[in-house]
Design a protein with these regions (language model features):
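Catalytic beta/alpha-barrel core
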Residues: 15-19, 34-43, 62-68, 84-95, ...
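Glycine-enriched alpha-helix->loop->beta-strand junction motifs that scaffold or abut catalytic
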Residues: 30-36, 58, 83-87, 102-108, ...
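Alpha-helix-loop-beta-strand connector modules within alpha/beta enzyme cores
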Residues: 47-67, 75-76, 83-84, 99-110, ...
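Generic structural signal for helix capping and beta-alpha/helix-loop junctions
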Residues: 45, 70-71, 98, 117, ...
Length: 193
């Protein structure tokens, strides 16, 4: 899925981040949205969300493990998600991503870069787990922070958080991000190939 993920981002730099599984019905029909992060749901809504996503070939839906309710945050929980048909996961917990990678799921390591120490820790984490992609929070971090990651990896680097306008998105991309995750509906409708 790593190559498919990069190809999907090449079609549009916006990754829709939906807070409720019900929002998938709104975002999946948008033709240029090819990647969706499900940030909030529970075990009851997830199975239906995965089935709905299956109606949209070429769309990639990943669930944020840390924000899912009713799923064990352990190997058994991740095995269950794979059994449901989930293709990928997002987490701040590198150990969970390690399990997910071992099961063949696409993995995105979310990193909060609040200071230089967080950058150093983030660099150590990606060496441990080698995720398929990185999501840096907030997307408005300075260019040098993104460049620190570019020096040591060729992973897809996304940014998320603190994006409200098209100008915010374009500024984040100009700083070196390959794409951005956006929970604001107005940003889902931006087509930025």
């Amino acid at each position: 899925m790593s190559t498919n993920f990069k190809q999907a981002l090449a079609k549009n730099k916006i990754v829709a981040a939906v807070k409720h599984s019900e929002d998938l019905a709104e975002v999946l029909p948008i033709p240029w949205i090819t990647v969706v992060f499900l940030l909030g749901s529970d075990i009851n809504g997830l199975e239906q969300a995965i089935k709905l996503a299956g109606n949209y070939p070429g769309k990639h839906v990943l669930a944020h493990l840390d924000l899912m309710e009713g799923i064990g945050k352990d190997q058994a929980g991740i095995r269950y998600l794979k059994k449901l048909g989930l293709k990928g996961v997002v987490s701040v917990k590198w150990q969970l991503l390690h399990y997910a990678r071992d099961l063949g799921l696409f993995t995105v390591q979310r990193l909060f870069l609040v200071d230089s120490e967080a950058i150093k820790t983030g660099l150590e984490i990606i060496k441990k787990v080698t995720p398929d992609a990185i999501e840096i929070m907030p997307a408005t971090v300075p260019r040098f922070a993104i460049e620190e990651f570019r020096k040591v990896t060729n992973l897809t680097i996304l940014g998320g958080g603190l994006l409200r306008t098209e100008e915010d998105v374009k500024g984040a991309l100009a700083n070196g991000l390959m794409g951005v995750t956006a929970s604001r509906r107005n940003l889902w409708h931006l087509h930025l190939p």
